[in-house]
UniProtKB/Swiss-Prot annotation:
Organism the protein comes from: Oryza sativa subsp. japonica
Functional note: ABC transporter modulating cadmium (Cd) import, thus controlling Cd(2+) accumulation to prevent phytotoxicity. Confers high tolerance to Cd in yeast. Prevents leaf bacteria proliferation, such as Xanthomonas oryzae pv. oryzicola (Xoc) RS105 and X.oryzae pv. oryzae (Xoo) PXO99, by triggering Cd accumulation, which in turn impairs bacterial virulence factors.
Enzyme class, broadest EC rank: translocase
ABC transporter domain sequence ranges: 170-444, 852-1104
Protein name (record): ABC transporter G family member 43
Gene Ontology annotations of biological process type: cadmium ion transport; defense response to bacterium; import into cell; response to bacterium; response to cadmium ion
Transmembrane domains' residue ranges: 540-560, 577-597, 613-630, 637-656, 659-679, 684-704, 775-795, 1196-1216, 1236-1256, 1284-1304, 1314-1334, 1341-1361, 1372-1392, 1423-1443
């Protein structure tokens, strides 16, 4: 060996190590000869390592690739310093390396290179270069690329019920004539080359086509777009390789399983994506090294081998990526989601990046990866990717919204895109030269990236014109693009594009021709392990379902108790049929929950499917297989509870045959609802259509209508209903038992026994063969449904696309923009012109300037289970530690810190938005203790997550906020003017009619949504404004617009504090003061910034060891770098302690002390009312909002009416004219069944469909409630009232259809009774749905509860078992069941006064209809008044429970 191996794995000369050893010996008084014995042992260790390496090289290639040598520390003898410096070489199985050992290996290698990623990568590269192995390179070209879309424009693009109807009709007409949609050009004849080993920065304003270009270059453009032109990788078109595996697209949308930890998420992506050609490259490397007699560094060798191990659940690549992206501190924290607390937004963005970096792709297209990151973190990540690009020959195109100068300088090439044109594509060094040739220059202390994004804007361009001798004129984007073609960089690019790429130079490993990273079997194993993990994390849900089934089983077994179940005559069969049907419906409804589970996981599945993580069928098959044990458990639970207690046929064989029937029924139900979820893909549509399918298979299942009574045109429905076969299997198994072999005395049925007589009367199979035929049919249905489910997963795309409304008149927009150009210039330049004064006029509504001081704030949460598992013994985790500060009127304060420092947490604590945890400390509002009720009235909070009602337009959202949050003293006209001015300030006036939509699915882009969030708070005219990441997700120009708005707000005397991640120099220096936090929620600076941040810089430069800031460097970035945890470790100081012992801290404490005393003459804030508007105005405003929202929600309301029409037509044709032909009790039973199904299934569809609608609005409600906008009861009233209006229309439509088609008697009282009961039923179903969402933590839990409730209501509706036959101990449930009252009301109003005579099966006598109903069903016509009152009662009860849940329960955890 050439040198000693230190604990870090680095080498040093024997001479230096010997000298150091001798010096220590003399210093410590040790015996130098004893030290030489230790040195001898080190020599022996080196010899052992060499022997092991020689043995390793003799192994076959496969075994050699799986073995490596690791050094492990051993006792070096003695008790001095050198005792710990000896190592033993151990041969290890790399393929089965323990995760802990893998992390230790990585830490040693990283420590050896002193955390310098580039040196670490160089060691990889040097090893390859040493034996002449060339890394693959990819050159991406795009030529004459055009992308366009067909769009509606103006208000015609809004998805109102009217427009949705017109679109449907237009779609049908367009099959014959051309559509009137307009062509929207997204990319316009763009050309360029993305070169390997060069970092390319893609810049451009929002909606310029950046994401579209990136998706097109990775072979994943939106299928609705028309793409023309040519895209090649190394001269090869997409048909010659798999672009999804060759390149990686990092989306700007963060889609992850919220229940998985960060490490698990990256481990899964690494496992699926595989190592590509790295294994073959490493095999060739080891072969060449062996032939050349080269011995590599054992630790580097082991690390490289560990990175190419495939199919394992844990991989060292994950640890490398975690460390490179700074995610190692949260590696074992769950990712989290909307309702589950997890990692921060910035960390989530890094997980999205890391997910793609774990794979083998060397062409990376990264879309806005810095959103939510601080500038220091962004710089570190981009620097790492730059090192990968330069050292490993990667090809990278990255778009960033606000790259600071130091990050911008890391890139080699710049692509500037605007309005679909490429304005510049070439070296970074030449781009300013290009714009100067056009007359525009970047000012000093202005970031170049910010300049580039503003100089193409009509409103911002003039300020950069520097040719004073020439009069300025607007230079359009198209003109810039033409000028670039004449510029020397553009001409060079054209020449390069004219020379085709030489395909023969393509590295064999550059382009991937293998579709997936793993074999099909390995993919299945990977997906199954992930799905099993998710099932365990959601174990509460499955336990709850089992408990729910247990309760339903208990109800069923006591409802049909064997002591009340005789089996001696034909009429006794009805109760057994009721028990079987109740069981069957319970099993079917139990499978309904699969619909929600399937749809919830689809977005993540689609992302991973499209990136070729795994074949779609492996995901589907994993879900199918993992639900088999669930079916076994639930079927076993049900039959054990019910079989013998109910008193079914006692033979053991029949017990197991019934179990088999339930098992395959459950499997069939799961397969059916999985299929519906995969096909329909929207929860609203799936719930509606799912209930319709359930209705069809139930309607034709042989219980509601027997086979002989089904109309000829519907008989196919009978034979294709899976439930018919389930019914047959259960009935044949029961009624062919020996105890039913009693002779049949009914001459009208030619069957020897009452068991067979019953089967024959229902049209069921009458032999034992019927059971096995039915089981076979159910298995067949299950297989067909599962195959179709796999096909749906494979071929269907996600529904919805991100889009906004295009202006109806582009020319008009341009003229308006031109007229505003001069005015905006004045605002930008901060002049005192009339426009600037006008822009602030809306901000001078009366308000009270207020200060906010806080002292010694601490915040704790319960210790997460993941951290407890790692050995943390504390019961609480401290997120904020002893934070003190003050925010004052007219002072703009920046709250800055690295990701996870606690910025949002502090803001939530101060704003009173925390719903969990323990808060300690003192908060004063202008000297008085803060009261949250009052504080909500005078403060605004712009949340980091932009939460808005998706079905409102931009204008409607802002008007609604102003309506409820401005004082009632502000008249309507003033309010309207104020709204217009706020919209103009944040430049939303051109988007006034744009639909807000759902993030990443439809509607506004990220930056448009951010501006809407700010506008919604600004129209409240608050005294104190909190803004959480107001510029996150915005480009430099939009961020400047927002900050100008904020500055204007501060200048009116308001108190404003903003958290901010990656401010540019000009944005950072627009702040007056800074509160800087470090990880752990501790303050390291609180004070003024000063001119050009001079005060801040002087403070840090005065700390010993802190490097001076270089000229032109961004102070925000410098500040974060010099105060980072790495800097603290290097300087061996704690910046929080430095601050706590500083004069600055003491002066801040003095300021807090001053602000803790009320100013002279200032009274504590109080308002005569809790809310700005009275209750009536709140109700009016909320009702207006809900009407607007419902009108623009066709997936819910249009589908509701379409399904009502379908339900009505199905019932009408199945029970055609039954109301006119009542001759026997069977006819009456058929009508009873029709009424029961008509009420129950459409009502249940309403209930289920409304769940996601109310759930989305509840998230918005939580924000509005925290803002103190209105009383929760006014919200409850508005949503209930609007839903009732739509339900009433639905009830009228439904009543007219089925009343006329079934043939009920046309009498006014009977018709209006029917109409009332239908409208009331729909009302209580929808109100119950709203109540469930308000009273449960998640939509998923609500959906699970629905199946329990519907099963219970079904059992006690009075149809499966009539009220007189219900055991006395359960009759209260019948009266508590709203569905039973509706069936009572409909049947009693239609027939309980009828004197018709009907025949009774099995008896020779006849009965009058009203007597039969009273004796057998318990229905009396005289009782109708009470039935009407009961419906009013249920509507009122469910409404008040909904109001209670909304008012008193809060399931949002913050």
């Amino acid at each position: 060996m050439a040198g000693e191996i230190t604990p870090s794995g680095s080498r040093r000369s024997w001479l230096s190590s010997g000298a150091a050893s001798l010096a220590r010996s003399l210093r410590d008084g040790d015996d130098p000869f004893r030290r030489s014995a230790a040195a001898s042992r080190r020599d022996a260790g080196d010899d052992e390592e060499n022997l092991r390496w020689a043995a390793l090289e003799k192994l076959p290639t496969y075994d050699r690739m799986r073995r490596g040598i690791l050094r492990k520390a051993v006792d070096g003898g003695g008790d001095g310093e050198g005792a710990g410096s000896l190592f033993k070489a151990d041969e290890v199985d790399i393929a089965n390396l323990d995760p802990r050992e893998g992390r230790e290996l990585m830490e040693r290698v990283f420590k050896a290179v002193e955390d310098d990623n580039e040196r670490f990568l160089r060691r990889f590269r040097d090893r390859l270069d040493q034996v002449g192995i060339e890394l693959p390179k990819i050159e991406v070209r795009y030529q004459h690329l055009d992308i366009e879309a067909d769009v509606h424009v103006g208000k015609r693009a809004l998805p109102t019920l009217l427009n949705a109807t017109i679109n449907t009709l237009e779609g049908l007409v367009s099959l014959f004539i051309s559509s009137n949609k307009r062509k929207l050009k997204i990319l316009n004849d763009v050309n360029g080359i993305i070169k390997p080993s060069r970092m390319t920065l893609l810049l451009g304003p929002p909606s310029s086509g950046k994401s579209t270009l990136m998706r097109a270059l990775t072979g994943k453009p939106d299928k609705n777009l028309k793409v023309s032109g040519e895209i090649t990788y190394c001269g090869h078109t997409f048909k010659e390789f798999y672009p999804e595996r060759t390149s990686a697209y990092v989306s700007q949308h963060d889609l992850h399983n919220p229940e998985m930890t960060v490490r698990e998420t990256l481990d899964f992506s690494r496992r699926c994506l595989g190592s590509g050609a790295r294994y073959d490259m490493l095999s060739e490397l080891t072969r060449r090294e062996r032939n050349a007699g080269i011995k590599p560094d054992p630790e580097i060798d082991a690390l490289m081998k560990a990175t190419v191990v495939e199919g394992k659940q844990n991989n060292i690549v994950t640890d490398l990526v975690l460390k490179a992206l700074g995610l190692d501190i949260c590696a074992d924290t769950i990712v989290g989601g909307a309702m589950i607390r997890g990692i921060s937004g910035g960390q989530k963005k890094r997980v999205t990046t890391g997910e793609m970096l774990t794979g083998p792709a060397t062409a990376l297209f990264m879309d806005e990866i810095s959103t939510g990151l601080d500038s220091s973190s962004t710089f570190q990540i981009v620097k790492y990717i730059r090192q990968v690009t330069h050292v490993m020959n990667a090809t990278v195109m990255m778009s960033l919204l606000q790259p600071p100068p130091e990050t911008y300088a890391l890139f080699d090439d710049i692509v500037l895109i605007a309005e679909g044109y490429i304005v510049y594509h070439g070296p970074r060094e030449n781009i300013l030269e290009f714009f100067e040739s056009a007359g525009f220059r970047c000012p000093e202390r202005k970031g170049v990236a910010d300049f580039l994004q503003e100089v193409t804007s009509r409103k911002d361009q003039q300020q950069y014109w520097f040719l004073e001798q020439d009069h300025y004129r607007y230079v359009s984007v198209e003109e810039f693009a033409q000028n670039f073609k004449k510029f020397h960089v553009g001409q060079k690019l054209q020449k390069e594009l004219q020379v085709p790429y030489d395909k023969s130079k393509t590295h064999p490993a550059a382009l991937t021709t293998k579709k997936y990273g793993l074999s099909s079997l390995e993919s299945l194993k990977a997906v199954m392990s992930r799905e099993w993990l998710l099932m365990k994390r959601n174990s509460f849900l499955f336990i709850f379902k089992a408990f729910q089934l247990f309760v339903l089983g208990f109800i069923t077994m006591t409802l049909f108790l064997r002591t009340k179940m005789p089996h001696e005559k034909f009429s006794d069969t009805s109760k057994y049929v009721g028990a079987l049907t109740a069981s069957l419906i319970t099993i079917m409804f139990n499978g309904f929950g699969e619909l929600q589970l399937t749809i919830d996981k689809l977005p993540i599945f689609y992302k991973q499917r499209d990136f070729l993580f795994f074949p779609a069928w492996t995901y589907g098959l994993a879900n199918i297989i993992l639900k088999v044990p669930l079916s076994l458990m639930e079927s076993s639970l049900w039959i054990v509870l019910t079989y013998y207690v109910v008193g079914f046929a006692p033979a053991a064989g029949r017990f197991f045959k019934q179990f088999l029937a339930y098992f395959w029924t459950h499997q069939m139900a799961l397969a059916l609802f999985r299929l519906l979820g995969a096909i329909l893909r929207s929860m609203v549509v799936a719930n509606t259509f799912g209930m319709f399918v359930l209705l069809l298979i139930f309607l034709f299942g042989g219980f509601l209508v027997s086979r002989k009574d089904i109309k000829p045109w519907w008989i196919w429905g009978y034979w294709t209903s899976p439930m018919m076969y389930s019914n047959n299997a259960l009935s044949v198994n029961e009624f062919l038992a020996s105890r039913w072999a009693i002779p049949n005395n009914d001459s009208s049925i030619s069957a020897p026994t009452i068991g067979k007589a019953f089967l024959q009367s229902k049209g069921y199979f009458t032999g034992e063969w019927g059971y096995w035929l039915s089981i076979g049919a159910m298995i067949g249905f299950m297989i067909v449904f599962n195959i179709l489910y796999l096909c749906a997963l494979t071929f269907l795309r996600p529904i919805g696309s991100a889009s906004t409304v295009v202006s109806d008149d582009d020319t008009k927009s341009e003229l308006e923009a031109e007229s505003n150009q001069e005015q905006m210039s004045e605002v930008i330049n901060g002049t005192n012109g009339t426009e600037n004064r006008r822009s602030q006029r809306g901000m001078v509504l009366p308000f009270q300037p207020l200060s906010l001081s806080f002292n010694h704030m601490n915040y704790y949460v319960d210790m997460p289970a993941e951290m407890k598992a790692q050995g943390f013994t504390e019961s609480r985790l401290q997120l904020l530690s002893d934070i003190s500060g003050a925010f004052r009127p007219g002072v703009l304060t920046a709250l800055v810190g690295v990701s996870g420092a606690g910025k949002t947490t502090l803001m939530d604590v101060l704003a009173g938005r925390k719903t969990s945890g323990t808060i300690e400390g003192d908060i004063k509002l202008s000297g008085y203790p803060k009261k949250q009720e009052t504080f909500a009235r005078i403060s605004g909070y712009c949340e980091q997550t932009d939460i808005h009602s998706p079905n409102l337009t931009v204008y409607e959202s802002i008007v609604y906020s102003a309506w409820l949050r401005l004082s009632s003293e502000v008249d309507k006209n003033t309010r309207k003017v104020f709204v217009e001015e706020v919209m103009s300030l944040v430049e939303l006036d051109v988007l006034r009619d744009a639909l807000v939509g759902l993030p990443g699915v439809s509607g506004l882009s990220t930056e448009q949504r951010k501006r809407l969030t700010i506008a919604v708070e600004l129209v409240a005219n608050p005294s104190i404004i909190f803004m959480d990441e107001p510029t996150s997700g915005l480009d430099a120009r939009a961020a400047a617009i927002v900050m100008r708005t904020v500055r204007n707000t501060v200048n009116t005397g308001r108190t404003v504090v903003c958290t901010i991640h990656q401010p540019s120099i000009d944005i950072f220096e627009s702040f007056d003061e800074l509160l800087l936090l470090k990880r752990g929620g501790r303050v390291i600076y609180a004070g003024q910034l000063g001119l050009h941040s001079q005060i801040l810089v002087e403070y840090f430069e005065a700390i010993p060891g802190v490097p001076k800031i270089t000229e032109g460097y961004n102070p925000a970035t410098w500040m974060l770098e010099v105060s980072s945890s790495l800097a603290e470790a290097r300087l061996d100081i704690d910046f929080a302690e430095v601050y706590a012992n500083s004069a600055l801290y003491r002066s801040n404490q003095e300021l807090i002390k001053q602000l803790s005393v009320p100013p002279p003459g200032f009274q504590d804030l109080s308002f005569p009312t809790k809310y700005s508007q009275n209750f009536l105005n709140q109700c009016v405003a909320n009702t207006w909002k809900q009407f607007q929202s419902y009108w623009k929600d066709p997936p819910y309301n249009a589908m509701r009416y379409v399904m009502t029409l379908l339900y009505g037509l199905v019932f009408g044709t199945v029970f055609w004219r039954r109301g006119k032909n009542i001759e026997s009790v069977n006819d009456l039973n058929n009508l009873l069944g029709a009424t029961y199904a008509a009420v129950f299934f459409l009502g249940a569809a309403n209930l289920l469909t409304l769940l996601p609608v109310v759930s989305v609005e509840r998230t918005v409600f939580y924000r509005e409630k925290a803002a103190g906008m209105y009383s929760p009861l006014s919200y409850a009233f508005a949503q209930g009232f609007v839903e009732f209006c739509y339900s009433a229309v639905q009830g009228v439509l439904y009543t007219i259809l089925i009343y006329s088609m079934i043939g009920y008697e046309w009498k006014a009282d009977k018709f209006f009774y029917f109409l009332f009961f239908m409208i009331a039923a729909f009302a209580y179903f929808t109100l119950f749905s709203m109540m469930l969402v308000a009273c449960t933590a998640s939509e998923m839990l609500a959906a699970v509860l629905v199946s329990f409730v519907l099963s219970s209501w079904n059992n006690f509706a009075g149809f499966i078992i009539p009220r007189p036959l219900i055991p006395v101990w359960w009759r209260w449930f019948y009266w508590a069941n709203p569905v039973s009252w509706t069936i009572y009301g409909v049947i009693a109003s239609q027939f309980a006064d009828s004197d018709r005579v009907v025949t009774v099966p099995g008896q020779s006598t006849t009965m009058v209809v009203k007597d039969f109903l009273e004796k057998n069903m318990g229905f009396k016509h005289d009782f109708l008044g009470y039935v009407v009152l009961a419906h009013f009662g249920y509507v009122i009860i469910f409404f008040f429970l909904f109001g209670y849940g909304i008012k008193c329960l809060n399931f949002q955890k913050r």
